Structure formats: C-alpha cells, structure tokens
Amino acid sequence: MKNFSLWCDFIENSFLDNEFLNLLSHGINGATSNPAIFKNAILNSPIYKDKILKLKGKKTKDIYEELAISDIQKAADKLAPLFYQKNDGFISIEIDPRLHDNTTLSLGEAKRLYSAISKENVMIKIPATKASYEVMYELMKNGISVNATLIFSLEQSQKCFEALNAGLVEFRKNNIALKEQNTRTPQAVISIFVSRFDRLLNPKAKEQNRIGILNANLAYNNIYSKNEPNIRALFASTGVKGDDLPKDYYIKELLFENSVNTAPLDAIEAFKGKMHFKKPLMNFEIYTELNQIISQSEREKACNDLLSDGLEQFCIAFEDILKAL
C-alpha cells in the first residue's frame, strides 16, 4: 500500500535482540515507547536488574534515562537500514510527562534527550497540550523529528499540524542548501488515540466500537488534506481489550495511505498478511454517522476527559518507575 507503515508499540531490551528482528523481517517499519511501556519493561524484565545495581547511587531519573536511552539507541540501530533506505524506521521516546504544562522545561528536556541519544531516526514524543505546541515548532525548526502524542480532538490535530508545519517551513528556509549539506528533513507524526474512545463511550453509544474509528478518520482527513508528506497521521491506542473484537480490528479499520499505525504485539500477529487498503470516509459521512451514535457534547467532553486521563496515566507510570528505582 502507498506509504502505509506499521510500527510496534513495545520496547524491551532482550526483545530488541530477538522478536523485534523477526518483526522487522516481516514488514514492521518502526517502534514507539511511552512511560507505561518502559514501566512494564524495567520493573518486570530481569535483564535490567544488573544494570540498575551498577547505577545505584545516581538520581533515580538519571538511572531511568540511562536504561531508556540505551534501549532507544539499540532500537534506532536496528531500524537504521529502514531509515536510510526508505525514510521510515523511527523509534519514539517521550519526555518526562510531568513537564507537559511547562514549555521551557519541555523544550530543554526534549533537546537534551535527543542529544544524549544521538540517533537521527529518533522521534521525541511531546504530549499535545497548550504548552507543547511551541515545543513542537522549535524541535522541527531545529531538525528534530517529533511524535505529537495524546491527540483526541480535531482541534488538537489541527494545532499540532500548524506548529509542526511552521517549524518545518523554518527548517527548510534555514537549510536552502539541504542536498549539499546532506541534512535530513525532520519527520513528524500526529498520534491519534483510537480505542480509548470506544472503551469510554461504548456504554453511551448506540453503536459499539465505531466512535474511535470515526474520530480518528476525521483527524486523518484533516492531516492528509494538507498534502505534507513529512507530517503523517499515526493511529495509536489500537489494542483490543477482551474477546469481542478481532485483535487487529483497529489496524484493519484504519488502513489508510500515508498513515502509520503503532500496534501491540498481539494485534500485529493477528494482522499478518492482511494488507487491504481501506478508503477513508469523507467528513460529511463521518459527522452523519457520529451524530446518529452519540451527541457532539458527549464527544467533546470525552476528548477533554481522555486527554486529562492520558496525561495522568503517563505521569503515574513515570513516577512508579522512579519510586521502584
């Protein structure tokens, strides 16, 4: 399919040396991480125990960063051939989520992490809050690829695009001799969360497991219509809880061109060999169906609630790691 990319929403040190290589050989083109994923890896995998012991005496955040940066560097190296051959092959790492309402601290942390990792195919993950749009702009302007995350509303996706695109324009303006300098243009993804909508709104909806798909389709249309190939829609939160849906439901339903889907391992396994292009619905079709399922006020409230909840969950996961270290 034209410019569709499937990424793995998981990272763990030993996994990167084994199962991850198998996934890459079967068409996986990138990977993502978040505080919850690192919490699960660091606190539950024995491979980190010796590393943590050797780092004892350092500040807990420094220990976390050494562990996380090491994994991100390893993933970036495994993905490097895809990056240099196909301009894909990215791995994402999120800044400290507790900084989401502080522009200055977020920007400083993002630049510091990018410098410490020192890999071109790393995307710095920035939550889409009011304080963060300036961060996205500055990173793109400085040639640092960005994963704008925790997008639930059309308004968020639009503000993310505006910030990222403005930074991209400035980067290009400042790098007129781009080809001569061999400087790569930064890439960005706008991560639209999908299944969380359905888990929240299914009890109130007249049709089950459709709101997340329709909402994501709407944001995708907005991003795709801008015709900027360096800024793509990414569908996140595409795992299925329970047995009422196929594990790859949210991959198959959002199989759109020039998009990315980052999925958990069970969804990727279920999806193998099912690459069938899906035609996105047009906006008027989306709104017609949405209005039949649930009210606009309920959707808007859900966007705000899900963003607040997502920020809180990532902050808790991050603090849990630090407490355990």
UniProtKB/Swiss-Prot annotation:
Protein's UniProt keywords contain Transmembrane: no
EC number: 2.2.1.2
UniProt GO BP: carbohydrate metabolic process; pentose-phosphate shunt
Active site: K125 (schiff-base intermediate with substrate)
Alphabetically ordered keywords of this record: Cytoplasm, Pentose shunt, Schiff base, Transferase
Family matches, as Gene3D superfamilies: Aldolase class I (3.20.20.70)
Annotated localization: Cytoplasm
Major enzyme class: transferase
SUPFAM superfamilies referenced in this protein's UniProt entry, alphabetically: Aldolase
Reaction catalysis annotation: D-sedoheptulose 7-phosphate + D-glyceraldehyde 3-phosphate = D-erythrose 4-phosphate + beta-D-fructose 6-phosphate
Pathway the protein contributes to: Carbohydrate degradation; pentose phosphate pathway; D-glyceraldehyde 3-phosphate and beta-D-fructose 6-phosphate from D-ribose 5-phosphate and D-xylulose 5-phosphate (non-oxidative stage): step 2/3
Molecular function GO labels: transaldolase activity
GO cellular component term, pick one: cytoplasm
Pfam families linked: TAL_FSA
Main function: Transaldolase is important for the balance of metabolites in the pentose-phosphate pathway.
Family: Belongs to the transaldolase family. Type 2 subfamily.
Name of protein: Transaldolase
